[in-house]
Structure formats: structure tokens, C-alpha cells
């Protein structure tokens, strides 16, 4: 199962458990649902939360454009428009939109329970960006794994690195772990040994300024062989050059105790662009991280910014979010892991 969920979404001809959230329009209608690839054949539609498998021709169908159709009388959960787009604020359950009104926010499993997972065949024609393989920049870590030497991997980041809102984080079926656990488990499998220690010191809601303040305790003290750094989502109001300086500090701090520490810098996914509070400079940080990586040996950039942008060309933000603001669901958690694993090759 693990190898299937980590099969890159940009390869192959079968999409496995791609998440979709069915939401009504304001008039109560439901549009055909665009999948990441135009589907040729639907193999399965299910709820990952309940395990219910829905029936072709009764609950759903496939249209001539490769979209998923929700049929009248379907058992598939359909979320009412007014349950997402709110007229009034609900304390701790909503955020203000740019154009007025409010959007539903939840970290209690609301979105996970409402989403369905679609497995389908497609033509395998991916025209979007493919993450760059940068294993040559991480040669020391690759060599340690190849020789099955003890390896210490540190994940330092915000709530996405903690695991929000993967189902394991929510303590709900199917209990998918955070991307950090997925990545390390896959490395153990690929390289055939268990002596890869994972340390995750990430904390939700934190930005790169906090990362600098906590660097000694949460990063330097561990002296990792490989560090995977995931800050930026909560830096939306931070100027890109200031963000770059903060990340530079972290690079130099960890290398002050281990000059051979190699680093993967994660360019973050995008927040919900409808919200005033979180949308900001996140899309600009890729350039800063790429520039930093060019200035030091042993640093690669895992580009989730571009990958998420590619996914959003065909899929709704609601299809891939765990909280409707700035967290992954199971599907996007898997994509995070896929991008990091591809970057490491």
C-alpha cells in the first residue's frame, strides 16, 4: 500500500485515491468535477473516513470530458454551499474573505469526512512541472544510506511538517501519518535498513522568525546529518529578502555544529487565496530558497509551490485541504512526500 500512495501523481496511468470534495453551487446544483487527469475509467470511489465504496451508475458516472458526475440521489456526501461560504463569522470556525463574507475553517475532521477518494485510469499525459531530481546535491546523505550507515534526519517546520491535517494527525481513519514519517519509512524500505533516525521538532503556527529564535534547542542541539526545513506558510506578511535571511541563519547555524549537514528546503504549498489573513508572499519564497541553494553546497529545494500550483489548475483548493486555509489533507500530504522523495533522487 505504501508504494502505491507514494507513486508520483505526475507519472503512470492510474491515479490512486485522489481526493475530491463535492460542494454545491449557490443555487444547489453540483458541477461536473474535474480530476487531475481526464479520467478514462473510474475504478473506485470511496470514503477514506467511513470506508464506504460508492456505486458506478447509481452514485456517480463519468462524462465525455473525463469528469466525475455526482448523480441525483447519490449517497456521496455533498456539502451545502452555505456550509462553506458563510454570511457571518463563526468564532474559531471561519476566516474573512477578500471580497466579503467568510469561509468555513475547521481542524476537527470536517473536511476529511466530507471528501471522497477517486481511483481511476487516465492517458498518462502530464504536461505540468516535474520536480527536479537533486540527489547530486545530497551526495553525502545518499552515500550514507547506500552504505547503510546510521543517519539522523531532522524535520524542522510549521504545522504542515507536524502533520496537519493528515488523518493520522486528526486520529481518524485511515490514519495516514505526516509526510515526514512517510518519507523516512520509504527511505528505510528503499535502502533496506532501519538505522535512519527521524526527529521532528516542528510546531504549528510558527514562522521563520520563531525558527531563528528556537534554532539552538530545536535544530542545532540535534546536529543532524540531513535537515528538511519547512517554513514559509506562516510568513505570508514577511518580505521575501527577510525570509531569505532567516533561512540563511538556519543553514549556517546547523552547519556550525555539523559542517557536512545536507539540507532540503521546502518551498511551501499555497494558502487559500480567498482569505485575507493568510494569502501573501508564500509564492515568492521559491525564488529566495533557490537562490540560497545556489550559494551553498549540499542544499536542494523541494518545490511544493509549483507542484501545488499545477494541481490547482485542474483541482479545487477544497479537494486538497485539511482545514480550508493552509493545511494538507491526506492527498496533499502524500504529494509533499512524493516531491521530497523525487528531489532526493
Which residues are covered by each model-predicted region?
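Charged helix-capping and loop-helix junction motifs
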Residues: 242-250, 281-286
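Proline-centered loop/turn at the N-terminus of a beta-strand
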Residues: 152, 197, 261-264, 300
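Serine-esterase "nucleophile elbow" of acetyl-processing enzymes
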Residues: 124-200, 214-223
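Catalytic His-Asp segment of secreted/periplasmic serine-dependent ester chemistry enzymes
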Residues: 268-345
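Oxyanion-hole/transition-state-stabilizing segment in secreted/luminal serine hydrolases
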Residues: 154-156, 162-169, 203-244, 268-272
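Active-site segments of SGNH/GDSL-like serine hydrolases
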Residues: 230-234, 253-285
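Short helix-capping segments at alpha-helix termini
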Residues: 189-194, 256-258, 295-298
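Extended beta-strand solenoid/passenger and fiber regions
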Residues: 2-128
Amino acid at each position: 500500500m505504501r508504494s502505491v500512495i507514494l507513486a508520483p501523481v505526475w507519472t503512470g496511468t492510474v491515479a490512486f485515491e485522489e481526493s475530491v470534495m463535492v460542494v454545491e453551487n449557490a443555487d444547489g446544483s453540483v458541477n461536473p468535477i474535474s480530476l487531475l487527469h481526464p479520467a478514462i475509467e473510474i475504478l473506485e470511489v470511496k470514503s477514506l473516513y467511513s470506508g464506504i465504496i460508492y456505486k458506478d451508475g447509481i452514485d456517480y458516472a463519468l462524462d465525455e470530458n473525463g469528469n466525475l458526475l455526482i448523480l441525483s440521489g447519490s449517497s456521496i456526501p455533498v456539502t451545502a454551499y452555505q456550509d462553506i461560504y458563510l454570511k457571518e463569522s463563526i468564532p474559531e470556525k471561519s476566516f474573512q474573505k477578500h471580497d466579503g463574507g467568510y469561509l468555513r475553517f475547521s481542524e476537527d475532521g470536517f473536511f476529511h469526512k466530507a471528501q471522497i477518494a477517486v481511483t481511476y485510469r487516465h492517458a498518462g499525459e502530464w504536461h505540468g512541472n516535474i520536480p527536479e531530481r537533486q540527489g547530486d546535491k545530497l551526495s553525502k546523505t545518499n552515500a550514507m544510506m547506500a552504505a547503510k550507515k546510521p543517519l539522523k534526519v531532522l524535520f524542522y517546520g510549521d504545522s504542515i511538517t507536524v502533520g496537519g491535517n493528515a488523518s493520522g494527525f486528526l486520529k481518524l481513519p485511515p490514519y495516514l501519518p505526516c509526510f515526514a514519517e512517510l518519507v523516512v519509512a520509504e527511505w528505510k524500505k528503499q535502502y533496506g535498513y532501519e538505522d535512519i533516525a527521524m526527529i521532528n521538532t516542528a510546531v504549528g503556527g510558527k514562522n521563520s522568525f520563531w525558527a531563528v529564535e528556537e534554532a539552538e534547542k530545536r535544530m542545532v542541539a540535534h546536529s543532524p546529518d540531513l535537515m528538511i526545513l519547512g517554513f514559509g506558510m506562516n510568513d505570508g506578511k514577511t518580505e521575501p529578502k527577510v525570509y531569505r535571511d532567516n533561512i540563511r541563519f538556519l543553514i549556517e547555524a546547523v552547519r556550525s555544529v555539523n559542517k557536512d549537514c545536507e539540507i532540503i528546503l521546502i518551498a511551501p504549498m499555497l494558502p487559500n487565496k480567498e482569505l485575507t489573513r493568510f494569502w501573501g508572499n508564500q509564492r515568492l519564497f521559491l525564488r529566495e530558497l533557490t537562490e540560497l541553494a545556489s550559494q551553498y553546497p549540499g542544499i536542494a529545494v523541494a518545490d511544493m509551490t509549483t507542484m501545488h500550483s499545477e494541481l490547482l489548475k485542474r483541482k479545487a483548493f477544497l479537494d486538497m485541504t485539511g482545514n480550508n486555509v493552509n493545511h494538507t489533507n491526506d492527498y496533499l500530504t502524500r504529494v509533499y512526500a512524493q516531491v521530497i522523495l523525487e528531489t532526493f533522487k
